[in-house]
Amino acid sequence: MAVTTSCTGSAPGNGGVAAGKPGTAGVGDRLFPGLGNGGYDVVHYGLTLDYVPETNHLKGTAIITAQATQDLSRFNLDLSGLRLRSTTVQGAKAQVARAGDELLVTPAKTVRNREVFKTVVTYDGTPRTLKDDDGGLEGWMETDDGSTALGQPSGSMTWFPGNHHPSDKATYDTTVTVPKDEDGDPYDVISNGKLITEEDKGKTVTRHWRTEEPMASYLAHVSIGYFETHKGRTDDDVPVYVAIDPDEAEDSADVPDLVPEIVDWASKLFGPYPFSSAGAIVDHLPGLDYALETQTKPYFGEAPEEALLVHELAHQWFGNSVTPREWKDLWLSEGLATYAEWLWEEERGDRGTTEIFEDYYDGTDTESEGIWAFPPADPPGAGRVSDPPVYGRGAMVVHKVRRAVGDETFFDILRTWTRQHRHGNVDTRQFIALCESKSGKDLSALFNTWLFDEKKPSRM
């Protein structure tokens, strides 16, 4: 791998540097070994962006507040493309080298273990769209009236530097300035969390959004374009912000009412809604073959079916608030969100969850194709992490737990899971332990058969 050095400061002196050691490049994720970085935990991202839709040019300043987990002589940040303009650590110029999508940052002085330190990176350029391991598109994508940024699993590094792995969650302030269009009309700028300020400066509009709860970087999001906005509140007084592209308005007419209805319904089953705002973004991005549970406002490239809306909103509990520590445990997000779809269908008086389970087992459900390709908790590679076993068979595991422990214990398990691990990271072992603790049963045979076994289980 070629390494090039950028001119962002003089090499540090010997004093203080030798006492520390470099943080690791990557956090040891089996499926994505290059994602994330060791040696520090990010506390907060302050992102200030200037974007010109007509030229797709982005200029950014990232203020990254982190706490060292060791004495750091050097640490890495993930950034794909974009020109690096300057980097400081604790106000002093840092030396930076680039190795692919890694920034190797050497501060002027060693950062001491447990020290809270601030890194400021300025950058600009044309942000990239990436093709991930399963062939899907992510990163910064142009739309017919602006752009959008989608991050799973690593696309967020195309528009801001950071520690891009779900095990390192942080709060965010995202401020975006966009010039008005040629007719003098403002673009809408939408991001995660609550809208804090909106400023019309004549030729430009600036919006400042804030996430008050920790967020994995793959859930960070910006959409720029023209939207019809709808505001409301849930029964628990959570503010709801729904933005719909005019091209999708007719087919999305029920979305503004469905979002608070689904959030209220899910809160009764899974526990209190975990964030201080809710909503959805329905954009017009033909060719995008997925939706994404971007935190507080799931993103859809077209008008969503009701079941898909349920799925992405359920992720606010399972995946966004309670986040897998490694990508191999993604079934904890996707299996539970898929099961939420089943519960919603049951609530609506259509198929019951047992009937859906049987349809999946028999292969008669349209979503059941390929679910026996591998165990849900053991995807064979990065390109398979979003395959049907993680979703459909993952939901079947959840249903088998429900049948084994009974409804009262099952929903107690779900509410305890979201309460105990609120805004944290989890793994499969913890979920199994909770199921066994709450039920008082040895469930090893169930999990070995349905979650870990390579073969399609016999009908039981």
Model-derived segments and their meaning:
Residues 60, 165-310, 339:
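Hydrophobic helix-coil surface modules that form long, contiguous segments used
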Residues 79-141:
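A surface-exposed beta-strand-loop module
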Residues 3-59, 142-145, 166:
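N-terminal, polar/Ser/Thr-rich
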